[in-house]
Design a protein with these regions (language model features):
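Conserved donor-binding/catalytic core segment of Leloir-type glycosyltransferases
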Residues: 5, 144, 187-208, 213-217, ...
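Nucleotide-sugar donor phosphate/pyrophosphate-binding loop at the beta->alpha transition
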Residues: 65-66, 106-107, 115-136, 174, ...
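Membrane-proximal helix-turn-helix segments that form the acceptor-binding/catalytic region
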Residues: 68-76, 93, 101, 110, ...
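Acidic anion/phosphate-binding donor-loop and adjacent secondary structure
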Residues: 121, 166-167, 171-194, 206-211
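Nucleotide-sugar-dependent
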Residues: 208, 255-293, 303-312
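Nucleotide-activated donor-binding/catalytic signature segment of Leloir-type glycosyltransferases, i.e.
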Residues: 230, 237-266
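A charged, aromatic-enriched C-terminal amphipathic alpha-helix characteristic of glycosyltransferases
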Residues: 325-332, 340-374
C-alpha cells in the first residue's frame, strides 16, 4: 500500500478532509502533518504542526519553520511515506524544510487550490514569492490544480515547461456517503415554495458577495430567503452577525460536515451563489468552487458572474445562470425573473439531473492514478 505524508494548512478544513477521504478510499494510507486554524479531532493519524490564524501572514511564515521542525521530529513516520503531498505554497515550503531537517529524499506533489494574492503582485514581494514557488515547483514531482484557470493564467505564464500538471477538480469523493441524486425530472406535482431560496455554501470569505446577498434580501423581503452555510472569514467580512440579525429573511446555519450534511443543505435551496471577489481579477476569476459540483450533484443550479472560469464551466455544461456586471443591478433582475417564473430553475434542475454523475463525483481510483503516474507508474486513464 502506498503511504502518503499529507502536509495540510488546516486539519479541520473541509477540503483537506475531502482529499484525505479520497486518498483512503482509493486504497492509499495517509498520515497527516497538518497545522490547524481551530481545535479539531481528525479522522486520520495526524502530527499537529501548530496553530495558525486566518490572514496572519507573518505568523504563518514563522509557523512554517516551527512546523517543519515538528514534522522532522517525527522522522520515522515521515520516512515511512512513499510520497509527500503538500497543499498550498506555505505547506510546500514546510514539507521541503522538513525533508531537509530529516535528511530525506521523498518525492513531493504540490497541490495549488488558490493562487494567493502575493503571487500576482508586480513588486519585489511578488517576484520573491514567485521565485520561491518556482524553485520548489521545479523540485516537485508533480503539480495538482483544481481549475484549468490556474494553469492558463498563472503557472503557464510564469513557469512554462517546468512542471507536470494534473487537473483534480473539487468533485465529491467517490467513496463518500453523500446519498442519492434527486429524481430524474423536477417533479411537477411538487408544490413550488412561495419564496426563492438562495444559498451561499462553503467558505464565506467575500464581502462583495455578502453585500449582494443582503441587498437581494432587502429588495425581495417577502419573495426571497438567503441561507448561509459555513464559517465566515472574519478578516474579510468583519461585520457579519449584525447584518444577518437585521434581516428576517437571511438565515445563518453555521458550520457543517461534508459530505454528511450536503444532501439536506442543497435540498433546502433553489439556487446557489457561486461568485467570489475576495481576490478579484485573478484567483477569484480563475477558480472552480466546490459548490458547483455539490450543487450539481443535488440538482441545485448555480449563479456565477460572467467572465469567470465558473461561468465558463456552467455555460459548457448548460446548467446554470450567468450574470453580467454590474451585479448590483443585474443580479436583482435575474432574481425578480425567477421569483415571477420558476421555469428556468426547473429547466436547469432537469439538465443537472441528466448530466453524467462523474461530472460531479470523482471516479474511484482517480487519486491513486495521479499518485502512481507521479511516481513513474502506469499512465492515468
Amino acid at each position: 500500500m502506498t503511504r502518503i505524508a499529507f502536509f495540510g494548512h488546516d486539519a479541520a478544513d473541509a477540503a483537506v478532509r475531502r482529499r484525505v477521504k479520497s486518498f483512503v478510499g482509493d486504497g492509499l494510507e495517509v498520515t497527516g502533518f497538518m497545522m490547524r486554524r481551530r481545535d479539531s479531532d481528525p479522522d486520520w493519524e495526524n502530527v499537529d504542526l501548530g496553530k495558525t490564524r486566518d490572514g496572519a501572514f507573518l505568523q504563518r511564515i514563522a509557523q512554517v519553520f516551527k512546523g517543519a521542525r515538528k514534522a522532522a521530529a517525527h522522522r520515522e513516520k515521515l520516512a515511512d511515506a512513499d510520497l509527500i503531498y503538500a497543499r498550498n505554497l506555505d505547506m510546500l515550503a514546510c514539507a521541503f524544510l522538513a525533508k531537509r531537517y530529516a535528511k530525506l529524499d521523498t518525492p513531493v506533489i504540490y497541490e495549488s487550490l488558490d493562487v494567493h494574492r502575493l503571487l500576482v503582485r508586480k513588486d519585489i514581494v511578488g517576484r520573491t514569492v514567485r521565485f520561491l514557488e518556482r524553485s520548489l515547483l521545479k523540485r516537485s514531482r508533480a503539480l495538482v490544480v483544481s481549475s484549468p484557470g490556474f494553469i492558463k493564467n498563472h503557472f503557464e505564464r510564469y513557469y512554462a515547461g517546468q512542471y507536470k500538471a494534473y487537473l483534480v477538480e473539487n468533485r465529491l469523493s467517490a467513496d463518500a456517503d453523500f446519498g442519492p441524486r434527486p429524481c430524474g425530472d423536477a417533479c411537477s406535482e411538487t408544490v413550488a415554495p412561495k419564496k426563492v431560496i438562495l444559498g451561499w455554501v462553503g467558505n464565506l470569505r467575500c464581502q462583495r458577495s455578502f453585500n449582494l446577498l443582503c441587498a437581494l434580501a432587502d429588495a425581495f423581503p417577502h419573495a426571497v430567503e438567503v441561507h448561509l452555510h459555513g464559517l465566515p472569514a472574519r478578516t474579510e467580512i468583519p461585520v457579519f452577525e449584525p447584518e444577518i440579525d437585521a434581516r428576517q429573511n437571511v438565515r445563518y446555519f453555521g458550520s457543517y460536515q461534508s459530505p454528511e450534511d450536503l444532501s439536506g443543505i442543497y435540498a433546502s435551496l433553489d439556487v446557489v451563489w457561486a461568485g467570489d471577489f475576495m481576490e478579484a481579477g485573478y484567483n477569484s476569476v480563475w477558480l472552480l468552487p466546490n459548490r458547483i459540483y455539490e450543487g450539481g450533484y443535488y440538482a441545485t443550479p448555480s449563479i456565477a458572474p460572467a467572465g469567470t472560469e465558473t461561468a465558463a464551466w456552467l455555460q459548457r455544461h448548460g446548467c446554470g445562470f450567468v450574470v453580467e456586471e454590474p451585479l448590483e443591478t443585474e443580479l436583482p433582475k435575474l432574481i425578480e425573473k425567477l421569483v415571477s417564473d420558476r421555469s428556468e430553475i426547473t429547466r436547469y434542475v432537469n439538465v443537472l439531473n441528466a448530466l453524467p454523475e462523474d461530472i460531479f463525483v470523482q471516479p474511484a481510483g482517480f487519486m491513486r492514478d495521479v499518485v502512481r503516474t507521479s511516481l513513474g507508474g502506469e499512465s492515468a486513464t
